[in-house]
Amino acid sequence: MLMNDAFDDFDMSVKSDRQEVKELLNLKFNQRCKKMKRKGKKYIYPEQKKYSLDILDAFKKGIHLTTFVAPVQWGKTGVILSLIHECCTSDEVFINPNNILLVTGMSDNEWKSQTQSRMIRELRSSVHHLHGVLNMKFDDDFRDALIIIDECQIANQEDQSIRKMFIRNKLFDIGFLKERNIRIIQTSATPDNVLVDAREYPSEQHYCSIVNIDFNDPYRSYKFFTDID
C-alpha cells in the first residue's frame, strides 16, 4: 500500500523524476516557511532543525531505527516535519515521499487534524491515528520509507495496535529494514516504555537522541516551548 498517492505521476526509479519531486518539495516547504514568517512565526525553529539533522546524519551512517525523546510541549512535531523534508530531499538517503507514514496509538481526531494542518498538502494523507493502523499491511514491494511513531509509548504493549502493526510488517527486523531501506523514528516524552527498547539493539543499529533542557535558562520559558511546538 502507498501511504499517499500525491506523487504517483513520478517514477521514483528515474533520476530526473526524483529530482523534480525534490524541487517541488523544496518549493512547497520554503513557501510554508515564508507564510509562517509573514505571521511573525517560524515553521521550523533552529533547535528543531538541529535535531532533525542529527537523526538524518544517523540515517546516512546506516542506522535504520531511531528514538527521539523530548519533554511535552518542547516541539517534537517540528523535528518530525523537518526530518521528513530532509529525508525526502536528501541526495544520500532516498525516501519515497509516497511512503511517509506518521502514526500514533492515540484515537485522537484533533491530533490527526492538527498534524495534517502543519504538513504540506501533498503529505497530509500520510498521517494516521489508531483506527488507521488497526489492519495496516504493507505491500510486498514496500520500500524506501520513513515511518514515524509519535508518542510511541501509547498502544505499544503486547496485543495492542501499534505493536501488532510492527510485528505484522516485520518492522522489528533490522535486516528487513536495511534490505528495504525503511527508516523508523519513534518519539516520546520519556525514554521509559518506548515501543522499541534501545537496549535490545547494539549502538550501530539504533540511534537515540534526548533533548536536555536547562530550565534555568531565561530564554527557554514555558511560552517558548509552547510556541515551538
Identify the residue ranges that each predicted region occupies.
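Short, conserved "post-DEAD/DEAH" coupling segment immediately C-terminal to helicase motif II
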Residues: 155-182
